[in-house]
Structure formats: structure tokens, C-alpha cells
């Protein structure tokens, strides 16, 4: 019961902060590109120092090495949900122009911008290393498998080279995480004032990210949403199929208690925003992708309590 209440308390925090962003957006407090600007501030300024501070605050050299094997589970579970997404797309007769986006939704989550703040709110900063392990697997699988499917939706056949994939993985949060890992493994001490500064700057990440979610939710045009089989199936894949694949693999690929909680939460996060960006860039069905992103964002608020109940 205590675990459920702890989870619900974290959920209330998430909903209240996102609700504040929603309320202020409806009142006209934000400028036109506020969501984009705050997202950039969160990704490039707040999250990198949060990565380093969290590693130093919650891990030692030996503990970090012991956590590395946990990386296998997210790779296997994402690939399993990728295969399951293919099966579901065939069963529902998803049109070829949407099939890549549909499958991508089933297996790829918004593991960094939404995943990290939600997990930090629920489990504290100790969850950040596990979040980053899932994020590494999630981003790698998106550019290795998902991106090709979306490009194929638009009639293209481009496959990303290893060099292109590595460049796509070079994001500020992952670079911050990599820097923290290298410094910690090298036993490099960080001065107290630097740790304090990183704590304060990194502390902006969760409230800013959640307020951006509220802003984005306030901009969703309800008239453009049609709950057909393509949308309902994608939501089932995102919030039921992906977490189920990971849940079933937990007894097969054992991980730490924290990683098991975080990975399950990460697997059930809303759809990845890069999916819509790529769909727009290559000429795939961007409208469908945008709708999937928006609806998954709203439904994510309601599915988090369900995942917490499963964990308890």
C-alpha cells in the first residue's frame, strides 16, 4: 500500500506541474515558440548537468560497473516490441503509408524528455542512470530500425550508416551522461561548488519538461483527432504491448530493482517526438504521426498509475 501511495504521490506531482503549464498556456502567459524554446533549454542546459550530478550522487566506481549489464534488457525488449508491432500492423491491416510510424510507436518511447523527468519525480535522482541505459537502447533502435521504416513509408529506401547513427546519438543529455561515466570511472573528484551548481541547474529539468507537456497538451486540436483502428492500435502498442514485452522479459533477463522499475516506466512513456520530426522531413504521413504523439501525450498521464500498480 505504501508503494502505491508513493507512486500516486509522484504522479500527483507530475500532473500538478503539467497542469500548471496547461493553465498558464491557456491564460496566454507563453510566447508562440515557448514549448520549443523550453524544450531546447531543458535538453541542452538542464539535463547534461543533471546526468553528471546524479551519477556522482548515487554511484561509486564499482557500483557503476555493476549496473552496466542491465543494458541488455531494454535492447531485447525494444526489439521484441518491434517484432510484435509488425504482427499487430498486419493483423489490423495498417496502410503502407502509416505502417512505419505505427510500428515505431509500438517499440520506441519518449525516454529522455518525458521519461527522465517522470522517473525522477517517481523514484528520485537514483533512477537517472537506469533512465540513460534505456535511453541509449531506445535511441539506437530508433535510428537502426524505426527511422528506416518511416523513410520507407514515404517511398524511400535509405539505410543509416554506422557513422550517421553515431552522429544521431550525440545528444547533449547522452554526452553529459558519457562525461559523468568517464569522470566517475577515472575517479576524478568534482569540487563541491561545481556539484552544487549542477544540482541547481539540473533541478530545472523536471519542472520545465513537465510544464512543456502541459503547454503541448493545451495546443492539441480535438477536432483533428479521429479514433480509428490506426490510432487505437498504435496506442495499444505504445501503452500495453511495449510494457508487456518488457514485463515478460524481466524473469528471463534479471536486472537491479531500480532498473526493473525504471525500464517498465520507460517502456510505457508516450511516443517519441523525433518520429514526427523525421516523418515531416522525409514526406511521410506527418499528420498521423503528430496525432499519435499528441494522443499518447495525454494518455500517458492516465497510464502511469497503472504501471505503478503493476510495480507494487
Predicted regions mapped to residue ranges:
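Alpha-helical transmembrane segments of multi-pass small-molecule/ion transporters
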Residues: 1-312
Amino acid at each position: 500500500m505504501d508503494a502505491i501511495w508513493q507512486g500516486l504521490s509522484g504522479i500527483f506531482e507530475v500532473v500538478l506541474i503539467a497542469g500548471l503549464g496547461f493553465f498558464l498556456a491557456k491564460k496566454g502567459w507563453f510566447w508562440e515558440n515557448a514549448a520549443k524554446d523550453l524544450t531546447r533549454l531543458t535538453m541542452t542546459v538542464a539535463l547534461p548537468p543533471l546526468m553528471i550530478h546524479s551519477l556522482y550522487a548515487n554511484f561509486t566506481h564499482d557500483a557503476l560497473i555493476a549496473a552496466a549489464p542491465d543494458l541488455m534488457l531494454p535492447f531485447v525488449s525494444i526489439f521484441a516490441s518491434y517484432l510484435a508491432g509488425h504482427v499487430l500492423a498486419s493483423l489490423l491491416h495498417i496502410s503502407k503509408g502509416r505502417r512505419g510510424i505505427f510500428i515505431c510507436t509500438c517499440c520506441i518511447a519518449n525516454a529522455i524528455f518525458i521519461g527522465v523527468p517522470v522517473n525522477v519525480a517517481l523514484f528520485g535522482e537514483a533512477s537517472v542512470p537506469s533512465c540513460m541505459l534505456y535511453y541509449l537502447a531506445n535511441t539506437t533502435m530508433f535510428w537502426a530500425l524505426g527511422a528506416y521504416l518511416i523513410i520507407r513509408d514515404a517511398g524511400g529506401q535509405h539505410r543509416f550508416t554506422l557513422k550517421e547513427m553515431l552522429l544521431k546519438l550525440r545528444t547533449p543529455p547522452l554526452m553529459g551522461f558519457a562525461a559523468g561515466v568517464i569522470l566517475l570511472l577515472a575517479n576524478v573528484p568534482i569540487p563541491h561548488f561545481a556539484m552544487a551548481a549542477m544540482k541547481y541547474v539540473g533541478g530545472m529539468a523536471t519542472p520545465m519538461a513537465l510544464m512543456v507537456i502541459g503547454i503541448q497538451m493545451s495546443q492539441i486540436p480535438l477536432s483533428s483527432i479521429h479514433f480509428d483502428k490506426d490510432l487505437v492500435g498504435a496506442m495499444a502498442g505504445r501503452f500495453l504491448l511495449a510494457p508487456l514485452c518488457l514485463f515478460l522479459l524481466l524473469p528471463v533477463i534479471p536486472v537491479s530493482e531500480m532498473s526493473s522499475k525504471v525500464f517498465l516506466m520507460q517502456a510505457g512513456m508516450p511516443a517519441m517526438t523525433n518520429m514526427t520530426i523525421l516523418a515531416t522531413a522525409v514526406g511521410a504521413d506527418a499528420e498521423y504521426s503528430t496525432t499519435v504523439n499528441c494522443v499518447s501525450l495525454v494518455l500517458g498521464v492516465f497510464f502511469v498509475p497503472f504501471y505503478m500498480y503493476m510495480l507494487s
